[in-house]
């Protein structure tokens, strides 16, 4: 029994690992280092392009629940994330290079996985998992359009935030701390008063953008929206978004600033930080000019500027079932962001489910029933829900899971009970999943 997995991103790596752990031989096809997408900078697998954060690790948050489900079920991605973790308050953030290197090492040394480098331009025979990502190469994308139909693919634009060197941040004008003093002081907080913010906002909303080929319709995913696009929605929009000061008290004044830019550690050494929520596609000189208007970043050394790229995803409700299999050809499955799940953890979760269920099918076992009460199951049921009329990428959230059958006072308490319900189900199927 052999399965070909196309793409060694988070979804493809997780899928290949789950298959291999269950005795299935895997041929993992990866076009790097022969060819790279515009968003990739290394030859490692599971490269994190937009951010080094896997978001909240709290069970009162849906993505925190999804991570806990995957941890309990033996996820490679969550295991490697835990081993390369950097402090980020209540979030799970990783040293992105250490994380990708560790995933690559685990995959390359697994006896059941054979890595074949080079671009894939056609769908091979036999069992196939397409996890080529939202930046699928043109040749493979053309082949998929032929296979699935011209109207099978949709798209949006995604952006990444800049990185700065820690030593170039003026700590006389910033302080270390986490929101509400929760956890350890892992963020560098760069405050602005109203006058400074207004000047910054005016410069940001009038700065020159880079040309992005085919960007005429300007579809952007809300969760990764360029900061300049968000700023144009209104003068104080950013103050209720990535620059919100709530829970951050400037130790120099004892008060909440008008706006705060947060920098999050990007590597284990703490020498590189990313600007949280500052995905952008401004021209590079404009990024330097505008972002240096943030007082603490007046002399910032930019190690990488923000970039923007086009993401492609499938019209999944029409094409895929709840196990991410192609309805018209069940030998072909899809995993990752191209299925319409949005986010690193969600991509890994789809790869996990495809790997587990494909291995069970090849071994003559029935599928594991991950119900909608679980985050893993809810994602698969969302992307295959044919009643969705205008399908768009979706982060995991409690809204796509069934409500509790009783009232609970307070959102955090309600979410905690939703998570407890889910994890009880996960424990009940864990032995079956791990078989």
What would you call each of these model-derived segments?
Residues 17-78, 372-383:
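N-terminal FAD cofactor-binding segment of flavoenzymes
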Residues 275-341, 348-350, 368-385, 391-395, ...:
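A glycine-rich dinucleotide-binding beta-alpha-beta segment and adjacent secondary-structure elements
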Residues 347-368:
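Internal hydrophobic alpha-helix adjacent to the cofactor/substrate pocket in enzyme cavities
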Residues 59-63, 67, 75-88, 148-157, ...:
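A short alpha-helix-loop-beta-strand transition element characteristic
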Residues 106-284, 288-289:
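Predominantly flavin-linked oxidoreductase catalytic cores and closely associated redox partners
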Residues 1-11:
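Beta1/beta-strand and adjacent pyrophosphate-binding region of the FAD-binding site
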Residues 65-69, 73-113:
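N-terminal Rossmann-like dinucleotide/flavin-binding domain of flavoprotein oxidoreductases
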Residues 394-435:
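C-terminal auxiliary extensions adjacent to catalytic cores
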């Amino acid at each position: 029994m052999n399965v070909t997995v196309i793409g060694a991103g988070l979804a493809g790596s997780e899928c290949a690992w789950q298959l291999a752990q269950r005795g299935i031989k895997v041929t993992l096809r990866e076009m790097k280092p022969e060819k790279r997408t515009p968003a990739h900078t290394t030859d490692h697998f599971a490269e994190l392009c937009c951010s080094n954060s896997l978001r909240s690790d709290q069970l009162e948050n849906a993505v925190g629940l999804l991570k806990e489900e995957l941890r309990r079920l033996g996820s490679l991605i969550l295991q490697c994330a835990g081993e390369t973790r950097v402090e980020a308050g209540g979030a799970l953030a990783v040293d992105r290079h250490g994380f990708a290197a560790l995933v690559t090492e685990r995959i390359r040394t697994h006896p059941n996985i054979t890595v074949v480098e080079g671009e894939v331009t056609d769908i091979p025979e036999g069992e196939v998992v397409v996890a080529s990502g939202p930046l699928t190469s043109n040749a493979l994308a053309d082949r998929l359009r032929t296979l699935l139909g011209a109207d099978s693919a949709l798209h949006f634009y995604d952006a990444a935030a800049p990185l700065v060197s820690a030593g170039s941040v003026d700590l006389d004008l910033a302080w270390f701390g986490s929101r509400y003093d929760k956890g350890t002081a892992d963020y560098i907080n760069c405050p602005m008063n109203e006058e400074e913010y207004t000047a910054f906002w005016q410069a940001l909303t009038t700065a020159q953008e880079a040309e992005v080929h085919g960007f005429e319709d300007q579809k952007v995913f809300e969760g990764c929206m360029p900061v300049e696009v968000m700023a144009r929605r209104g003068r104080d929009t950013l103050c209720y978004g990535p620059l919100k000061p709530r829970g951050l008290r400037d130790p120099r004044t004892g008060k909440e600033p008008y706006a705060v830019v947060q920098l999050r550690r990007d590597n284990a050494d703490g020498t590189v930080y990313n600007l949280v929520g500052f995905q952008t596609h401004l021209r590079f000189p404009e990024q330097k000019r505008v972002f240096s208007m943030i007082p603490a970043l007046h002399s910032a050394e930019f190690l990488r500027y923000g970039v923007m790229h086009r993401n492609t995803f499938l019209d999944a409700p029409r094409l895929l079932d709840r196990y991410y299999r192609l309805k018209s050809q069940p030998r072909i499955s899809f995993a990752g962001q191209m299925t319409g799940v949005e986010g690193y953890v969600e991509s890994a979760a789809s790869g996990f489910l495809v790997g587990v269920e494909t291995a069970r099918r090849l071994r003559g076992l029935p599928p594991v029933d991950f119900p909608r009460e679980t985050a893993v199951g809810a994602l698969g049921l969302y992307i295959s829900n044919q009643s969705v009329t205008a399908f768009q990428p979706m982060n995991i959230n409690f809204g796509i899971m069934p409500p509790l059958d009783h009232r609970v006072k307070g959102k955090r308490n309600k979410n905690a009970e939703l998570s407890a319900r889910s994890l009880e189900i996960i424990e009940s199927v864990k032995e079956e999943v791990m078989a």
